[in-house]
Amino acid sequence: MTNSKYAMTATEVMEVIPNRYPIMFIDYVDEISENKILATKNVTINEEVFNGHFPGNPTFPGVLILESLAQAGSILILKKEEFQGKMAYIGGIDKAKFRQKVVPGDVMKLEFEITKFRGKVGKADATAYVDGKKVTTCEFTFIVDEAAEQEK
């Protein structure tokens, strides 16, 4: 860990999960514990998605909010000693709700909390916030592929 005000920098995040530009949505991790993570995604107008979603009314797609939450969860899962270097996948998304749109300039706080973990399968509650307000909530089912090794 570097001398930083963050629990993990973007560089440290890239040592844990395989996502890279243009599909890397974690700028840094604010806090991480055994079963909970809080990460940050700075939404900027320079993101490729805003070229088409939507011209004149740029809106960060809901599916990418879910992907951002999933990436935060992957960090939490793959930081566990027994899963380091493995791959984590979404097995299901339930009860997804989108409460308000996310636009360029927003700072999304991504909270992912594991509620059940048995073997290599688990469940988690996830919430994205902007300015302290919930913008998206959902429940994830996740699976760790212990046979898969990340390419470095």
Predicted feature locations:
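Hydrophobic beta-strand-centered segment that forms part of the acyl-chain substrate-binding groove
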Residues: 2-7, 73-109, 135-143
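N-terminal leader/capping segments at the start of a protein or of a new domain
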Residues: 1-26, 31
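Short, hydrophobic/aromatic-enriched beta-strand segments in well-ordered soluble domains
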Residues: 41, 111-114
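Small/polar/charged residue-enriched interaction surfaces, especially the RNA/DNA-contacting tracks
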Residues: 6, 19, 39-42, 144
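HotDog/MaoC-like acyl-thioester-processing domains
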Residues: 3-5, 36, 102-106, 113-152
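Catalytic strand-loop segment that frames the active site of acyl-thioester-processing enzymes
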Residues: 21-60
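Conserved positions in beta-strands of structured domains
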Residues: 27-30, 94, 99, 113-115
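Active-site helix/loop of acyl-thioester processing domains in fatty-acid/polyketide metabolism
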Residues: 29, 60-83
